Amino acid sequence: MLRLYFVALQFLAIIPIPFSFRCREEDLGRSMSFFPLVGLTLGLLLAGCDYLLALALPRPVADLLLVAILALVTGALHLDGLADVCDGLAARGGRERFLAVMKDSRVGAVGVVGLVLALLLKYQALFAVTTDKWETLLFFPMVARFSQVQLTVGSKRARQDGLGSLFIGGAGSMQVAVAAFFTVVTGWLLLGLPGIGCAAVCSLFTCLAKAWFHRKLGGITGDAIGCVSELNEILCLMTLVAIGGRF
């Protein structure tokens, strides 16, 4: 169990692990059960950084640094997926054209605009959190990592290569159930009803995104997983801002 957590951590973050372990290909799909716990680990890092930054910096600067820290510690992997999907949306053509543009290592103008807007929205949504900030910092990366599991399980591969193809088909209902349990229980313990409501909103969005990618591309890719993860981070923060003070 612990080994699978470290497999997930090694894939989702660039946090150094001070020991080596064997990772088999089938471990990648099985490790998705622990994706939300990796999100919680990232949240703990953000909460700790927030405590230290608040000692010396005004909140606007501290929150901007938190967004930067999250991007750095994840290697900007999911932001890259968001940019690629934005470029794919801007490309005129069918499925093959969309996939070809996403695979291109260069980032186009629409991808840059998408990145800037996403980072600004994430920063503004985080800055708008007025209550339960540490609880929010713990929870929103967790919800986004659960969305990766939800999007992946039961999906088809839009193409056979890429990082996403290693996970698609390797995880099943057990991984979704375990990941959902971790996410829902943590959301309830940290935030109560707003946490459950936020998880439900993000889960619904992920279902819609999953259907859209299957209709557009015939399946999902690693870029699609990263894009949906980034959008769910923003959606989670915005939802908590919208409903947090009502309960």
UniProtKB/Swiss-Prot annotation:
Q: Which cofactor does it need?
A: Mg(2+)
Query: What is the first-listed, main subcellular location in coarse terms?
Result: membrane
Q: Where in the cell is it found?
A: Cell inner membrane
Example of a GO cellular component annotation carried by this entry: plasma membrane
Q: Does the keyword Phosphoprotein apply?
A: no
User: Do you know which HAMAP family this protein is assigned to?
Assistant: CobS
What is a single molecular function from GO for this protein?
A: adenosylcobinamide-GDP ribazoletransferase activity
Q: What is this protein called?
A: Adenosylcobinamide-GDP ribazoletransferase
